[in-house]
Amino acid sequence: MQLTHVLVVGLLVLTSFQPINAVTNRVDCSAPEDKSEPGYWCGLEPLCCYSGKCFVICFGSKPAGT
């Protein structure tokens, strides 16, 4: 029963396409070393950087060596 609730909440988060402010504040994904381009991941989080913001949905692949 709890697993279903977690999945529903997860789907709501994934479909929201909203920046995660907590992660954006913690990870500066606009830094040059993070390659602020679609498809690049924000630090160790499974989030992508789009225009300097960390998003839940990642349309690209994680860069090699990170």
Swiss-Prot record:
Keywords: Disulfide bond, Knottin, Neurotoxin, Secreted, Signal, Toxin
Localization (cell): Secreted
Presence of the UniProt keyword Mitochondrion in the record: no
Residues spanning the signal sequence: 1-22
Domain-level remarks: The cysteine framework is VI/VII (C-C-CC-C-C).
Role of this protein: Probable neurotoxin.
Designated name of the protein: Conotoxin Cal6.21
Native source species: Californiconus californicus
